[in-house]
Amino acid sequence: HEEWMACHQDFDYSTLDNMQCWGGLDLGSTRDLTCLTLLFNVDGKFVFIPYIFIPEENAKKRSARDGVDYVAWLRDGHIFGTPGDVADYSFIRKKINDLSKKYRIQSICYDRWNASQLVIDLQNDGATLDPFGQGFVSMSMPTKTLEAEILSKNIIHNNNPCMNWC
């Protein structure tokens, strides 16, 4: 955790506008968070921007269950609330399409286990999506690479408390 925290830097995120980036999407439903993380390569450093979503109606209950304050994170803009008590994929789709206008998203990898209509809709919207399994075979090398980049301080993140907790 301290190695990750050491990668926080003050960074002018507006300089990323219209830059090329790649995304990773993990779809939650009722018990999990949904997260889109965008990754930018800026002068050899990897800049992460997380967009984390939780159903608004169960944020308080989930705060008690998970021992973190989702309600405060919603209030402070660190995570986004979707309408209802399950993940609202139409809300998430709109956010991804809005981000596609701000950044040049090259592709979004997603967990094929929880693939849904959202993936089809985003592809119909013009997004490039690539399935990515979350098993040992597919996750081992990327996880080792991420760990090495964190230890080398080649990562920049915005100190999002939810991302730090995850």
Regions found by a protein language model. Name each.
Residues 1-134, 140, 144, 157-166:
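RNase H-like, metal-dependent nuclease domains and their acidic two-metal-ion catalytic environment used
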Residues 143-152:
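Short, surface-exposed amphipathic charged segments that create phosphate/polyanion-binding patches used
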